[in-house]
């Protein structure tokens, strides 16, 4: 398997699609929000990106759950392994592509995580704490727990709930075997990354980001559920429900996405410290040069 990872706005999908076309294979998404149907603009889910040379590259684990649903790492592991086994059975090496580091690390390491039930007592104890306080509590549980996507109090409380359950119910990593993968990271300097994020945010607003969120609210999805998803869905929902003005929404969202990208890179650097070999490629290289660099590594790795 080939794994393509990197921060938001670095061009992961473009590289993965080019490689999949070249190798005649399929992609498995590692994005915690692209799984939801109807959440398209805010997650960067442009299905046209998967068209190359007149061919549509199959991408698994996109649009598999309704918006408003709750999805977790336990479910992702099972869904990933179904897609992974299906692709292998058809004689292809899958390409895993995404920016949710916890999903990537869990499937590569073969972590076994249980389906964690709600803990009302713990939730009551955590209610009323700020996101900063909750993030500090979560950090005390160690590196395994995903802090990358925790940008609302609701998500932080759920992450702590999972971490607390695992601490009290330790499980051996036996259900899923580790996966040997060539890991490619797309590296983007900070200034370029920030500019891309800002430019992309302006573009998403022009493409109908606010209308997308309004449509989700009008379909009956509670505002709190959209806030749970964070980033665009959180900030635009706050704007549409009258809790902030447009300018504050935009600047707050822009800052949050910059912070999110920084947390992604922190996670990937942490993966290296935990023993993963990541081959970093300059994200500013032309697409064909990126593809050639990966192909050389892929061939060398057998």
Curated annotation (Swiss-Prot):
The record marks 100 as: Interaction with substrate tRNA. One of its GO terms (molecular function) is ATP binding. Keywords: ATP-binding, Magnesium, Nucleotide-binding, Transferase, tRNA processing. InterPro entries: Dimethylallyltransferase, IPT, P-loop_NTPase. Gene3D superfamilies: P-loop containing nucleotide triphosphate hydrolases. Its EC number is 2.5.1.75. It comes from the Bacteria. Its cofactor is Mg(2+). ATP binds at residues 6-13. It catalyses: adenosine(37) in tRNA + dimethylallyl diphosphate = N(6)-dimethylallyladenosine(37) in tRNA + diphosphate. Substrate binds at residues 8-13. Residues 31-34, 154-158 are annotated as: Interaction with substrate tRNA. Pfam families: IPPT (PF01715). One of its GO terms (biological process) is tRNA modification. Belongs to the IPP transferase family. Monomer. Catalyzes the transfer of a dimethylallyl group onto the adenine at position 37 in tRNAs that read codons beginning with uridine, leading to the formation of N6-(dimethylallyl)adenosine (i(6)A). This is tRNA dimethylallyltransferase 1. It comes from Porphyromonas gingivalis (strain ATCC 33277 / DSM 20709 / CIP 103683 / JCM 12257 / NCTC 11834 / 2561). The lineage of its organism: Bacteria, Pseudomonadati, Bacteroidota, Bacteroidia, Bacteroidales. The gene is miaA1.
């Amino acid at each position: 398997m080939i794994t393509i990872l990197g921060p938001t706005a670095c061009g992961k999908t473009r590289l993965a699609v080019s490689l999949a076309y070249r190798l005649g294979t399929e992609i498995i998404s590692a994005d915690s929000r692209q799984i939801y149907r109807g959440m398209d603009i805010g997650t960067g889910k442009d299905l046209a990106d998967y068209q190359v040379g007149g061919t549509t590259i199959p991408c698994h684990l996109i649009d598999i759950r309704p918006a408003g649903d709750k999805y977790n790492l336990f479910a992702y592991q099972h869904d990933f392994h179904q897609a992974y086994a299906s692709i292998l059975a058809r004689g292809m090496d899958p390409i895993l592509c995404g920016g949710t580091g916890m999903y990537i690390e869990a499937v590569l390491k073969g972590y076994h995580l249980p389906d964690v039930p709600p803990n009302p007592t713990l939730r009551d104890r955590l209610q009323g704490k700020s996101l900063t306080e909750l993030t500090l509590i979560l950090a005390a549980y160690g590196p395994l727990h995903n802090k990358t996507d925790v940008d609302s109090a609701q998500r932080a409380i759920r992450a702590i709930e999972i971490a607390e359950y695992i601490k009290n119910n330790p499980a051996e990593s036996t259900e899923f075997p580790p996966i040997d993968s060539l890991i490619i990271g797309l590296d983007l300097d900070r200034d370029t990354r920030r500019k891309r994020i800002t430019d992309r945010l302006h573009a998403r607003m022009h493409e109908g980001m606010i209308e997308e969120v309004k449509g989700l609210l009008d379909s009956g999805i509670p505002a709190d559920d959209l806030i749970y998803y964070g980033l665009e869905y959180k900030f635009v929902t706050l704007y549409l429900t009258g809790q902030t003005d447009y300018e504050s929404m935009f600047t707050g969202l822009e800052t949050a996405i910059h912070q999110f990208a920084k947390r992604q890179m922190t996670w990937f650097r942490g993966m290296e410290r935990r023993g993963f070999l990541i081959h970093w490629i300059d994200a500013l290289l032309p697409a064909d040069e990126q593809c050639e660099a990966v192909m050389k590594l892929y061939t060398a790795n057998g």
